[in-house]
Design a protein with these regions (language model features):
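Catalytic-loop region of hydrolases
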Residues: 1-40
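N-terminal cap/lid subdomain of alpha/beta-hydrolase-fold enzymes
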Residues: 29-87
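Conserved acidic catalytic loop of the alpha/beta-hydrolase fold
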Residues: 101-120
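Conserved hydrolase catalytic core segment
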Residues: 117-157
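Alpha/beta-hydrolase-fold enzymes
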Residues: 142-221
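Short beta-strand/loop motif that positions the catalytic acidic residue
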Residues: 257, 263-265
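Conserved alpha/beta-hydrolase "acid-adjacent" motif
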Residues: 270-279
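Catalytic active-site module of serine/aspartate enzymes centered on a nucleophile-bearing elbow/loop
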Residues: 278-321
Length: 321
């Protein structure tokens, strides 16, 4: 699928911190119908994800595909690699100062260069959902449907605390990527999920608990496909999520929007808390914003947005009519 990767250059961009970037290169992929022949859906990937959202290696292939909930017979799907994610990037400057709002501005410039004036929907999971909020706050009429999944419009103190610990692990561990991944898996899932799956069973060959073997497996896998610089950079982007960083209010940022907003929460998520989504929905409903909070029921916590594909597909099928 890397063969389908396309490159685009943003000639001039000034970040919120005043950095002037010349010839800033990004990569992206299209899936489904040829651009200009069908409604366009932008899908923003998660922290360790990339633009391969569909197909054999796609991280959402059960949701995005021919005759799937996001039907590639009906839609053009675009996925842009978040700068710094390391996917086919050979010379990315990791010292560049960007926040998630900057990335949103850059993505909007990509859409402009591709001559996509309006999207049918923006969908994003985890940090991709935060990015979806950021794009909607910058350009209120960017899409007919705004669909953040297992995410929020800001990094709350709990998320900041976890990204702070992730950063400490990445700076100080002998196996920074592996150990940070092990820590992350404990808040991407839930106690109930792990207890039900492993039941204190042992890996007799290794002489360790199966839950430990499983965590080691995830650590090894991420080491094979993710760089330390990318992990640090994306972790920093995640903690910067905040559409009100200019000290405005949520309502002020979103109220001009005529888009439908569909927040998809996970009832057991201990990373992006469903209570925060309920509060956001309540606040924006008071302002007559067209908003609905959909809930995935799962024991699996944050990662349910990758696991509970049937529930997510059912929700998307109702939204993307």
């Amino acid at each position: 699928m890397k063969d389908d990767l396309k490159k685009i250059v943003i000639e001039n961009f000034e970040s919120s911190s005043g950095n002037k970037l010349q010839n800033f290169q990004l990569s992206y992929q299209f899936f489904g119908k040829r651009l200009g022949t069908a409604p366009v859906i932008l899908i923003n990937h998660a922290l360790t994800g990339n633009s391969i959202v569909s197909g054999k290696d796609g991280w959402w292939s059960e949701i995005v595909g021919i005759n799937r909930a996001i039907d590639l017979n009906k839609f053009t799907v675009l996925c842009i690699n978040i700068p710094g994610n390391g996917f086919n990037e050979e010379d990315f400057n990791f010292s560049v100062e960007l926040d998630l709002g900057d990335v949103a501005h850059i993505f909007i410039k990509v859409l402009d260069k591709l001559k996509i004036s309006k999207l049918y929907a923006i969908i994003g999971g985890s940090i991709g959902g935060c990015l979806t909020w950021e794009m909607a706050a910058i350009k209120n009429d960017i899409a007919e449907r705004i669909i953040p999944v297992a995410s929020d419009w800001k990094a709350n103190d709990w998320l900041i605390a976890n990204t702070f610990l992730q950063d400490r692990i990445l700076e100080n561990s002998k196996d920074p990527i592996g150990d940070a991944r092990i820590h992350a898996m404990t808040f991407y899932r839930t106690p109930e999920s792990l207890n039900q799956r492993f039941s204190r069973s042992m890996n007799n060959e290794k002489g360790i608990f199966n839950v430990e073997s499983w965590l080691d497996h995830h650590a090894i896998k991420l080491n094979q496909r993710f760089s330390l610089s990318s992990y640090k950079f994306l972790n920093k982007l995640l903690r910067s999520a905040n559409i009100t960083r200019d000290e405005s209010r949520l309502e002020t940022k979103i109220m001009p929007s005529k888009s439908e907003i569909h927040i998809i929460s996970v009832d057991s998520d201990i990373f992006f808390l469903p209570d925060e989504d309920r509060m956001t929905t309540k606040r924006l409903k008071k302002q007559k914003v067209k908003i609905k909070n959909h809930v995935i029921e799962s024991i699996h916590g944050h990662d349910a947005f990758l696991i509970e594909t049937k529930q997510i597909s059912d929700i998307f099928t109702k939204i993307l009519i």
